[in-house]
Amino acid sequence: MRHYEIVFMVHPDQSEQVPGMIERYSATITNAAGQIHRLEDWGRRQLAYPINKLHKAHYVLLNVEAPQEAIDELETNFRFNDAVIRSMVMRVKHAVTEASPMVKAKDERRGDRREDFANETADDADAGDSEE
């Protein structure tokens, strides 16, 4: 079986349906004896340019190992699902399992916020001790 990277963008008004879509597409892959190596829900993001007069979309990334029949079925599902505004399926040489740069950047920002919060609470505790 070959390895694929799949990205699809969902209409922002249909963001509530994304978990169900992910479940359905994941089931399609696993039922065809495929394997999901990485699944990332990037959430609602700004588009680089408007698509169908939309400026935002909900992004989902999948890295899978699956037979061609499963990929064909996924592409057909993307094509006939009105909520999916764009999709891209690329064949890659090896399975990709590490976090994508999008998730790494998000985690770094979250880590910086945690450190800032920890520093603020420590400063507040120090200030409270000196007042007594």
UniProtKB/Swiss-Prot annotation:
GO cellular component entries: cytosolic small ribosomal subunit
Transmembrane region(s): none
GO molecular function, one term: structural constituent of ribosome
SUPFAM superfamilies named among the record's database cross-references: Ribosomal protein S6 (SSF54995)
rRNA-binding is among the record's keywords: yes
Biological process terms in GO annotation: translation
Biased segments, Acidic residues type: 121-132
Keyword entries, A-Z: Ribonucleoprotein, Ribosomal protein, RNA-binding, rRNA-binding
Biased composition (Basic and acidic residues): 104-117
Record region (Disordered): 99-132
Domain of life, per lineage: Bacteria
Annotated NCBIfam families: S6 (TIGR00166)
Family of the protein in this entry: Belongs to the bacterial ribosomal protein bS6 family.
Function text: Binds together with bS18 to 16S ribosomal RNA.
Protein name: Small ribosomal subunit protein bS6
UniProt source species: Serratia proteamaculans (strain 568)
